[in-house]
């Protein structure tokens, strides 16, 4: 009788350990947080305003596509952005982008990019719709301008690298 009790006790411990193991695995692999690693292309209409000394400002309104460089977050998304900055390149360029995911849900981000280091900016999520409602995110962003084939347009490659958490 003592052996049966020990066997039952051991079996209970094993089952309890399995249950706890499954619960903790689910907690860490819940899909509610992860890394952002996106790269893409951006094209926009731009307007420039200068004074007689060459000091001025620029504004733009455009869109582009993004793809995930690692993982799947944000793969095959599009972005629509508006922004502004100063010329000559002192201060920051700032703006907002709406990221549209493949399932039609969106996330809105705010960004600031130093004009003397266009690959060294920061971004953060302001909110989202659908699955991305309540999203929080932050990280690094930047761009490398490409010589435009058309006057009044800007073209660039850009990136977002950071982390996100979805509302549970």
Question: Would you name each region that the model predicts?
Answer:
Residues 2-14:
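Positively charged n-region of N-terminal signal peptides that target proteins for export
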Residues 20-21:
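Short, linear, compositionally biased motifs with a strong N-terminal bias
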Residues 30-168:
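Beta-strand-enriched cores of mature, soluble protein domains
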């Amino acid at each position: 009788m003592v052996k049966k009790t020990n066997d039952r006790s051991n079996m209970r411990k094993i089952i309890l350990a399995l249950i706890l193991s499954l619960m903790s695995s689910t907690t860490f692999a819940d899909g509610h947080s992860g890394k952002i690693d996106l790269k893409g292309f951006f094209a926009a209409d731009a307007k420039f305003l200068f004074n007689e000394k060459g000091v001025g400002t620029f504004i733009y309104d455009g869109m582009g596509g993004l793809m995930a460089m690692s993982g799947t977050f944000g793969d095959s998304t599009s972005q629509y952005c508006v922004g502004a900055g100063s010329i000559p390149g002192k201060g920051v360029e700032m703006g907002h982008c709406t990221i549209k995911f493949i399932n039609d849900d969106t996330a809105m981000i705010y960004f600031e990019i130093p004009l003397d280091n266009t690959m060294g900016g920061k971004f953060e999520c302001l909110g989202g719709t659908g699955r991305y409602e309540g999203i929080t995110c932050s990280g690094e962003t930047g761009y490398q301008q490409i010589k435009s084939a058309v006057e009044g347009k800007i073209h660039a490659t850009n990136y977002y690298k950071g982390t996100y958490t979805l509302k549970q």
